Amino acid sequence: MDVKQYLTEWSECYRKDFVENIMPFWMEHGLDRKHGGVYTCLDRDGKLMDTTKSVWFQGRFGFIAAYAYNNIEKNPEWLAASKSCIDFIEAHCFDTDGHMFFEVMEDGTPLRKRRYVFSEGFAAIAMSEYSIASGDKTYAQKALDLFNRIMYMLNTPGFLTPKYLDTMKSQGHSITMILVNTAARIRAAIDDPILTEQIDRSIKALRENFMHPEFKALLEMVGPNGEFIDNINGRLINPGHCIETAWFILEEAKYRNWDKDLVEMATTILDWSWDWGWDEQYGGIINFRDCKGFPQQDYSQDMKFWWPQCETIIAALYAYQATGDEKYLEMHKKISDWTYAHFPDKEYPEWYGYLHRDGTVAQPAKGNIFKGPFHIPRMMIRCHTLCNEILG
């Protein structure tokens, strides 16, 4: 492989696809110029199917638009889009108890709350990234304040409803891993000891509790001290989620001058998760596996969703940067070839989100409450910059 040519071509591809395809689609069809914020329930051609707004995506697109401004080009429309999402969040997305909503109507009228703090995490990274883009430090402080609020909610018994009753005490991979990225993104705008302290706690928990060498797997749910829970949910492996965790840890390793222990931990998770996730028969990263080989109960267990492919593309490139091992470039090529052959719509902009196991399209919409402008554009921005860093 001609590494220089390979990385140069991909760098240009990511930028072009983002600037000419992904971002214009969401700016034209998603951005709500009347109420502020962003719609995500868009059909294949961009037609609005549902005016319900995902609070996750007010933060996620607020982040992406500012992240693009900081890393792709200083487009004032992108900066304004980020501000629109943040303004909408501040005006409409917080309940009186400080806990954010999950869904709101187009004008911000509350619809639904959930027992998580992911809305808060996405809002915080939008504010921190906007602070970097705009130079307005008040948004960095808002992000840090919101992070402190997240920690309060997580650490105050009874504030958030637990997933299970006390008969089965457990801890989840999702919040543990997402705090690594949330804290790191905020730290880029405002440094505070609480951020690196939480990253250290999360990484310790991932290493000591969630990584299970006996299965060569990082599990989604374990006991309070990492105990293996031998039921369907305790045996669950979500390969795409684990691979996302791997690159979060690689990003932290880079921040710490390529900390060897973190690189080894992250590449171990990536290697394990690739082995569980890659579909040898049809290609692509599969949704769910059982660490003991039993059938998974989730009805989408053998489907190919957009986001695990995106996270694998990032992680493989990051692992190559960290190690120089060309096996990760081969991994990047394998997942990229499959992803780009199956997910981009050849007739309309943007990508499909949901494929059957064999790579055929399950449904053609470009967005809903869970799919919107986040994983795909983040992959393109991050990988464009990674390629350029590696090329020097």
Where are these regions (language model features)?
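Glycan-recognition and catalytic cores of secretory/periplasmic carbohydrate-active enzymes
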Residues: 1-392
